Amino acid sequence: MKFDMSAVILTMGDRPGALKESINSIRSQENVNVEIVIVWNGLVPNYSVDAETHVHSDVNIGIPAGRNLGASNTSEKIILFLDDDAQLISNDLLYRIKRLFNSDDSIAIASLRIIDEDGLTSRRHVPRLGSKSEAISGQTTGFLGGASVARKLAWDQVGGYSADLFYSMEETDLSWRILNAGWKIFYAADLQVEHPRTEPTRHSEAIYLTFRNRIWIAKANLPFILIPIYILTWLGITVARNLSSSKALLAIFKGFISGLSSSPLKRSPLSWKTVARMTKLGRPPII
């Protein structure tokens, strides 16, 4: 069968019902044939699940490495990345994505609009700063990995996600590298994905990894003069958000020390042209 695009779903096998619904929402798409790749992260594949390709890792390799594994096993030029508990809402969504990517070959990534079971979009799910409505499409400086579409050419050019990040900040890191390579990131407000309402992760391990990874990506991607500005800005924001929790504050401190004392990511700083472009788009790489 000739496919129009690929879809990658990363799963740890703990939501079989939701995974089936995610796959069904892809299979129900009209006017497109989709190659589905399931990545079984840390477990043996369930080959009865409907997919063209099943790949797996014996241990939990993390979100970025898991999605990289899926992408490396796709065959098409456009790749949908979908959380295993998310569903495409309309049956023509992937056809419209195909048209979007065909209409502008400078788009590397499209971030889809996430709505919850009540049809609402959380502010943290809109990949831009400011009060601009979640219903307005446009270029952005970031995207949401579990409801996104990537052009394989751009993905391969920059090397996909940084696997060392394991959890958190991988989208920001990839966004910076995509923009620095001259590509666009587009928030498509009219292309909607339903995902159950969730609260921001506040447990200590997530806080630790997020802050450590912020420092790692800053040291890898930012011009030297911006590195301390970015780190100190986010130190202030993160501490302010977690003042009531001593465990969270300890996790921030540990992440700060770990991030400063290690640098696993290859350094390739943003050009000042890219910094200016990001600033014009409303999010300079200091926040």
What is each model feature region?
Residues G142-A150, A154-G159, D164-Q192:
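A short, conserved alpha-helix in the catalytic core of glycosyltransferases
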Residues L209, I225-I287:
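Non-catalytic, C-terminal membrane-associated alpha-helical segments of glycosyltransferases
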Residues M1-S25:
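N-proximal low-complexity "stem/linker" segments adjacent to membrane-targeting elements
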Residues N24-N33:
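Short, acidic, metal-binding catalytic loop of nucleotide-sugar glycosyltransferases
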Residues D4-S6, E35, D173:
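Cell-envelope/extracellular polymer assembly enzymes that use nucleotide-activated donors
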Residues I79:
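Short aromatic/hydrophobic "clamp" motif used to bind/position activated sugar donors
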